[in-house]
A protein has these predicted regions:
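Class I SAM-dependent methyltransferase SAM/SAH-binding core
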Residues: 1-47
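A short hydrophobic/small-residue beta-strand
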Residues: 14, 87-88
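A short acidic, Gly/Pro-enriched loop at the edge of an enzyme's catalytic core
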Residues: 43-58
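A short SAM/SAH-binding and catalytic strip from SAM-dependent methyltransferases
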Residues: 56-70
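A short glycine-rich, Lys/Arg-flanked "PGG" loop and its adjoining helix->strand segment in the class I
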Residues: 71-86
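C-terminal alpha-helical "lid/dimerization" subdomain adjacent to the S-adenosyl-L-methionine
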Residues: 90-161
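C-terminal lobe and adjacent flexible extensions of AdoMet/dcAdoMet transferase-like proteins
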Residues: 145, 171-179
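Short proline/glycine-enriched turn/loop segments at secondary-structure junctions
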Residues: 161-167
């Protein structure tokens, strides 16, 4: 609910989604604690329960990399966008690069047992997107759906404070698509 709460505080009408009920409950609690008007619903990003041409903007953060069918998600996101609407997708090649990262004490997964990390790595390799070159893949796909796309590969340092970079050491990028 990070972006959802910020955007609602700026006066926007916001609907945040996640496929995980616990994440939605946590987002609702956080929104309530800060007086946010953001709404939240359990929903699959690859199969949205919204009408066509509903939204002006879709903002996603750290989502696309772990979807089984990211191409379907992009198609759905464009479907629910109004003409001239925008997708802002902040993501990184986590699935592709995570298994190469040093497991130092400053890593996001420092408290996870090695056996569970190995299972995660196996799943990462099964994800379609782990075999692509991103964000180039995203750009080509969205352009094939007739969106106008720009990529910002320098967005990471503007989002993460220096002391937080250890937490997610894979460079973040922004995929901006206009319908």
């Amino acid at each position: 609910g990070f972006f959802s709460i910020i955007l609602s505080e700026l006066g926007h009408t916001v609907m945040g989604i996640d496929i995980t009920p616990n994440m939605i409950e946590e987002s609702k609690l956080l929104a309530q604690s800060v007086g946010s008007t953001a709404q939240f619903a359990v929903m699959d990003a690859e199969n949205l329960d919204f009408d066509d041409n509903t939204f002006d903007i879709i903002v996603a953060r750290n989502v696309t990399w772990n979807l089984p069918h990211p191409d379907m998600a992009y198609k759905e996101w464009l479907r629910v966008l109004k003409s001239g609407g925008m997708i802002l997708n902040y993501d990184a090649e986590y699935a592709k690069n995570h298994h190469h990262l040093p497991q130092s004490v400053h890593n996001a997964h420092e408290h996870i047992k090695p056996e569970l990390l190995e299972k995660c790595h196996t799943i990462y390799h099964m994800l379609f997107i782990s075999g692509t070159n991103r964000p180039e893949w995203d750009k080509q796909l969205l352009e094939s759906y007739e969106a106008t796309v720009t990529i910002d590969s320098t967005v990471g340092p503007r989002i993460y404070a220096e002391e937080d970079e250890f937490y997610i050491p894979v460079p973040m990028f922004l995929v901006k698509a206009i319908k």
